Amino acid sequence: MKASFRDYINTLRKNDELLEISKPVDLRDVAALVAQSEKALLFKNLPGYSMPVVSGLLQSRKRIALGMGVDYGNIGDKLGKAMDKPIKPKRVANAPVKEVIHTGKKVNLYDLPVPVFSIMDGGPMITAGVVIAEDPEFGINAGIYR
């Protein structure tokens, strides 16, 4: 299955798993709103930023399964097959990720709308990678560890 991040967002839309918010939302409120939502949230209007933020993409089993293109019960099989036959990465000349490229002095990380996840955080952090681990007794788990 070939898919892009945009395809995944559209899949969430079609399956009523995405709530799009057009009214202005302060970036400091994003994490709290995501925690309260049963859907993934797409914030289209963050004052001070020129790009949207989407969050909550992996907060439900249904959304994970939709992203993988399988029913929930088949996630383990799909992951197992992918791990048994990994696909080598390849460079491509054109891709959506290459639509906007900043280099040199044009790079400014403060342009990115990076939320604060907890009141105890020292400030905004780019974090929250997904770790997939397999335990012989309990099976496969996907988690976010900071």
Give residue spans per PLM region.
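Extended, highly charged
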Residues: 1-146
